[in-house]
C-alpha cells in the first residue's frame, strides 16, 4: 500500500500526529500475557503474594481471591478481626462554593443535611433513572466532600462527575485521589480493640469519619460496613500502605487476625444483602427494581434521573431483585428460577452461608405478581427480604 501511494503521489508525508511505536506481539508473548496486562496493582500486591494469596482480576485490578482457605477468612471477620485491601475504590474530593448544590443535583439523596464528620450511602443514577454506581458521601467541611465509588465503576464515575460540573457550570473543584490513596478495611468484632492498640483511642461511631493517626500513619478513618461487622476503612497515602498493613497484622496476631479475599467477602456481603453494581444490577436497574427506594428522596426538587423515576413509578412493577434461601448448597450464579413450569428469572449472586448453614441468593424475578416459593436447580427456594444475617444491623453499629 505504501509503494502504491508513493508511486502516485511522489512520496508519503510524515504523520501529523504523535504516535507511540508499536509492533505485533508473538504468540508466545500473547500466551504469557506480555504487553497486554492492563490490570492495575494496589500498593499491597506483594504483601498479598507473600501471604500466599491467589490473585485474580476483578474490576480492572489484580486482587486477592483467597489466601488458601476462604472459609477460615470468613470466620476471622465474623468472630475476630480481619484486614481487606480496598485501595481499588474510587475516591474523589469535591469542593467549592457550590459543592452542596452540585451534589444535590448529582445524587438522589439529601446532601445539605449531612453534618460535617458524617457519611451517607448514595446511589449514582443516569438520566433514565438507572443505577450506574454506588458509594459513600463523607462531609469533611461545609463545602468539601469525599466521594467513594466501586472499583469497576470508578473511572466512569469520575468522568460522569466532571461532565456534570461542566454542564451545570457551578463553582466546583474535583480532585481524583484513586491512585494516590490506598485503603485498608479493618473489620470484625475485635476491630475496635485492634485500632485502640495502634493509637486510635477515640473511634468514630457508625457512619462517622475522622482524621487521625493509626500506627503513626495519617489516615482518614471511615466507620461503615460492607461485611456486616464493625468496620473501619483507613484511607492513607500509598507510600505508607505496606507499613500500616504490617503494623496492623503484627498488633493483631494474638487476636486471631487474618486477611480476607474477595471469595470470603462475597459471602459476607451477600449475607447482608449488599448489592454489587454490575453483578447484581442490570443496565436498566432502577432503585425500585432493586428494592432500594429508601435511597431516593423524590421530594427533592431535582436530581439526575428524577423525571424518569417519576414516570416509571406510574408503571406496573415488572421485575424485582429479591432474596432467596434454600437448604443445602447454593446453586451456581446464573441458574434459572422456575415457577409454575416457566422460567421467571435468574440467580445473580449465590453462596452457601457458613453462619446460617444454608444457601442465600440474590435473584431477579421478572414476572409479577412475585411468588413466595420458586424452584432453583430442581429444589424449592423461598423468596425473602434481605438481609439474611443480623437484619437489625446491630453488629455493624456495635
Predicted regions and their residues:
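Acidic, proline/glycine-enriched N-terminal capping motif
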Residues: 1-125, 130-132
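Well-ordered mid-protein domain cores that form the structural environment of catalytic cofactors
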Residues: 113-167
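Residues forming anionic-ligand binding surfaces in small-molecule and nucleic-acid pockets
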Residues: 76-87, 131-144, 174-177, 214-231
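Glycine-centered loop/turn motifs
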Residues: 115-120, 154, 204-210, 331-335, ...
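Helix N-cap motif at beta-to-alpha junctions
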Residues: 97, 150-155, 189-191, 237-242, ...
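Glycine-rich, acidic
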Residues: 3-26, 39-45, 62, 165-317
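Short glycine-/aliphatic-rich beta-strand segments at the starts of folded cytosolic domains
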Residues: 82-108, 177-196, 316-326
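Glycine-rich, small/acidic residue-mixed loop/short-helix segments
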Residues: 4-19, 37, 285-398
